[in-house]
Amino acid sequence: MSVKSVPIERDVTPGLTYPALAGSDVRAPSVAAVVVCILLVALTLRPGIVSMGPLLTAIIDELGLTHTQASLLTTIPTLLMGLLALPAPWLAHRFGRDRIILLALIVLGAAIILRALAGSIGQLFASTAAVGAGIAVAGTLFSSYVKARSPNRIALFMGIYATAIGLGSTVAAVATGPIDQLIGDWRWAGGFWVLPALLAIMAWVGIEHRSLRAPVSTSSTQMPRMPLRNPTAWLIALFFACNNLVFYALIAWLAPMYIERGESASSAGLILASYTLGFMLANPVFGLLSRSDDRRLLLAASSSIALLGSLAMAVAPDAMPLVTAALAAFGTGGAFTLGMTLPLDNASTPEEAGAWTAFVMLQSYLVGAAGPLLVGYLRDSAGHFQSALWLLVAVGALMLLVTPFLQPYCCRR
């Protein structure tokens, strides 16, 4: 594979100061090699979470878990995505970004295998936490890798990255149920998803072996200051938190809900796949439509679509579930794409943008982690999922009500 000699890039995350790797000249991988890395790593960042949805009913039956306890299999990884948003950049500064990404991928792959071998509930939850840690650290640092390796193609490469994440989610949602039926064991149906992780590890070592060997400078790191006293920052965090809560609640419980309503595991997996596919398709659509600095109209439109889909599932869950799930996902996917730009719209410098992004991600994933837990608790309390669906409708309505107040900084002056 062709390579060219360029100075090694700096490990840059907005809002943080990173030194370059020691050494003045390191041969960077080709564009094609970078694309391979992006695709394989992105494809492995969601199956460890999404694959649990089609398997929750089997896990509950075998281990005797309550729905509240089972919800932790999705809640724990999502929670760690928020908690590890801040220490991950420090680890990258201390030990090198590419080394930490490799370590995170190894942890992710090992944890998926350990979860398949779990002999107790404690081991199941501990291995799930390790899955979440690997996803959280790799996902947090990988956008920095994309920006560093493709400074002139950031939009294109980030689009490839986001689409590959959605594709990995969709494939896991579609395939996990049939794999479970074929193998007859939920453990190895979940353990199957170590294969993308192994491919990502091999690609990472093969393509980024030079940066993995390069020594790292350890000068001081300037951490960003979070906008704790800014009302707009809290409103953005609230909007993003509502969106994450709805998304992760449905990722965890959509398949079990329809299995409980009489669908087979494969059919329920297809409904979940329509949800992940709708989310993936919304990313480029709303990204292309968003041309104005003031995105409130599109934010309201995406929130309304998400609310309409959730409302349709609550009122008539058996009426065209493939369509209603895709509708809800298209709205949450659009809100996610637009919401990611809001911290940047309200920041005047890269350092400030990093601080806003870290603040929003921390708050939104911590709240989003409560979604699967709340749905599981309401299912245990009520004996059905109907009250949980109405909770998601209420959260979607709150998200819509927040949109008029998400005016960017440039339009407030």
Roles of regions detected by a PLM:
Residues 137-150, 334-348:
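Intracellular juxtamembrane helix-capping segments at the cytosolic ends
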Residues 100-113, 297-312:
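Structural signature of the two symmetry-related core transmembrane helices
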Residues 152-153, 159-209:
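Helix-loop-helix hairpin linking two adjacent transmembrane segments in secondary transporters
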Residues 52-53, 231-273, 279-283:
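Extracytoplasmic gate region of multi-pass secondary transporters
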Residues 127-164:
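Cytoplasmic helix-loop-helix junction between adjacent transmembrane helices
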Residues 83-122:
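Conserved MFS/SLC helix-loop-helix module at the cytosolic interface between two early adjacent transmembrane helices
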Residues 64, 96, 117-122, 151, ...:
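Helix-breaking motifs and short loop linkers at transmembrane-helix boundaries and internal kinks
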Residues 350-386, 392:
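A late C-terminal transmembrane helix in Major Facilitator Superfamily
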